[in-house]
Amino acid sequence: MKFAFIFPGQGCQSVGMGREFYENSDPARALLDEASSFTGIDFKNLLFEPGDKLDVSEFTQPAIALNSMMALAALQERADQEKLSIAPQFLLGHSLGEFSALSAAGGMEPKQMLKLVNIRGRLMQSACEGKGAGMMVILALADEAVEKICADATSSGKQVWAANYNCDGQIVVAGKKDDLAALEGEFKAAGAKRAMLLNMSVASHCPMLQSAGDELLEFLRPALKESFAPVVANATARAYTTKSEALELLKAQLISPVLYKQSIKNYEGEADCFVEFGAAVLKGINKKITQKPTFSITDLASLDEFLKFAKENR
C-alpha cells in the first residue's frame, strides 16, 4: 500500500481542534507544548478556548499547521506501537498546507515551521493592508472561462486573478474586493452557478502579495534543511526535494495560483491512498478529482478507522 500525505490550508479552523490528540498522544502533547514555548503563542488557549484570535491570519496559520502536525504525530505513535509502516511516497499541502507538508517531509523542524507560518500570516496581512483585498469562489464554471474574465478585467485596469484551482467546477479568484464584486454578474452570465465573496481580508496567491514573498525568504532561508522527501509544489504541481528549490517555490507560491487539482492528477498514480491530517476539507475535494480513497485524521475515531484500513491492506 502506497500512501500520500496531504495537509489542509486556511479556513478549516475550529475551536477544540486537536484536543483529542493533545489529551491522548504523548508526542502530540509534546509538540504543542514545545511549539508554545518556542513561538511564544499560547496554543492551548488558541486551539481549545473560544476567542477571536483563531480567525486572525497570523494565528490561524500556525494553529491549523499545528493541528495537522499533532494528527501526524498521533498516527506515527500508533503506527509504531502496532508495527505498521506508513511512510508517504510524496506529500502535498493546499496553500498554507504546503508548509505543513514540508515539515512532515523532514524539510523543517515543526516548531520552526510554526513560527514561520505565524510570520507568513503577518506578512500577508501587512501586504494587503489598506488595499481592499478579497477572494471569491466561483462554482460550476470552466477554468478557461474564469481565466478569460480575469484577463479581460486586468487588461482594463482591474486587479483580479485566478488563485486556487481546487477541482473541476471550483476555482477561487483573488484581488481587490470591489473589482471582484463588480465581476460577480459577469461570472454568472458566463454560466457560474455561484460567485460568492469569501470572508477574507487578504488576497492570497496573486501579485498583491509580492512584498510578502520577498520578506518571507529572509525567515525561510535559515529554517530549511538541505534535502527532504518529495513535496509537490502548489506553484508548479511538480515535486521538489531540495532547499534551493523550496526557497524559489515557496516565494512563488504567495503570488501564484494553487494548482491543487493538477497536483493530484499528476501524482495520483504514485499512491493507492491519500491521508489528510487535521481536517476533512481536502477529502471532499479529492472525491471530485480522483477515485483513490482519502482518509482524514481529525480525531481518535478517524485515526482508528485509517489504522484499520492500513492493517487490512498491508
Cite the ranges covered by each PLM segment.
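Glycine-rich phosphate/pyrophosphate-binding beta-alpha loops
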Residues: T60-P62, V202-S204, P257, K261
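Alpha-helical scaffold elements within enzyme catalytic domains, especially in hydrolases
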Residues: E20, E34, E186-A189, N266
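A structural micro-motif
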Residues: I41, I86, K158-V160, K193, ...
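NAD(P)-dependent dehydrogenase/reductase Rossmann-like domain
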Residues: E218-F219, I297-R314
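Alpha/beta catalytic cores of group-transfer enzymes, especially the acyltransferase/condensing modules
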Residues: G11-C12, A105-L254
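A short, acidic, amphipathic alpha-helical segment used as a generic capping/interface helix at domain edges
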Residues: I255-D272
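FabD-like malonyl-/acyl-CoA
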Residues: M1-V146, F274-E305
